Amino acid sequence: MKFFVITLIVLLGLLQYRLWSGDNSLPEYFVLQKQIAAQQDGNAKLNERNQVLKEEIIDLKSGTEAIEERARNELGMVKEGETFYRVVGGDRAVSSPSQ
């Protein structure tokens, strides 16, 4: 009976060692849980970005307003009959009086 109890205690010690410091231990489990959470956050952000891009693609395929807006902003195109004005030096630094 004594041998049986000693064997159980040794097995319990080995299992505890494996649980706390072996492969697939609890500390490793918690690190992996943090990595999974970070990856899921990144995936959620990328899914939102993909949804915005899908909506933009649908908008570009279906209507001319989005194409016209992009042409105006990115290519500087102007409608017939409009006058184009360019403001030069619009970003002036405001200087405060020195003391």
Swiss-Prot record:
Q: Would you tell me the Gene Ontology cellular component terms?
A: cell division site; cell septum; plasma membrane
Q: Which residues cross the membrane?
A: 4-21
The listed locations are:
Cell inner membrane
Instruction: Tell me the Pfam families matching this sequence.
Output: DivIC
So which stretches are on the Periplasmic side?
Answer: 22-99
Print the keywords alphabetically: Cell cycle, Cell division, Cell inner membrane, Cell membrane, Coiled coil, Membrane, Transmembrane, Transmembrane helix
Determine if Cell division is one of this entry's keywords.
yes
Q: Does the keyword Nuclease apply?
A: no
Q: Which residues lie on this side of the membrane: Cytoplasmic?
A: 1-3
Which parts form a coiled-coil structure per UniProt? Answer: 31-73
Task: Name the InterPro entries for this protein.
Answer: Cell_div_FtsB (IPR023081), FtsL/DivIC (IPR007060)
Q: What GO biological process terms does the UniProt entry carry, in alphabetical order?
A: FtsZ-dependent cytokinesis
Instruction: State the function annotated in the UniProt record.
Output: Essential cell division protein. May link together the upstream cell division proteins, which are predominantly cytoplasmic, with the downstream cell division proteins, which are predominantly periplasmic.
Q: Please report which protein family the annotation says this sequence is part of.
A: Belongs to the FtsB family.
> Quaternary form?
Part of a complex composed of FtsB, FtsL and FtsQ.
UniProt-recorded name of the protein: Cell division protein FtsB
Which species is this UniProt entry from?
Shewanella oneidensis (strain ATCC 700550 / JCM 31522 / CIP 106686 / LMG 19005 / NCIMB 14063 / MR-1)
By which gene is this protein encoded? ftsB
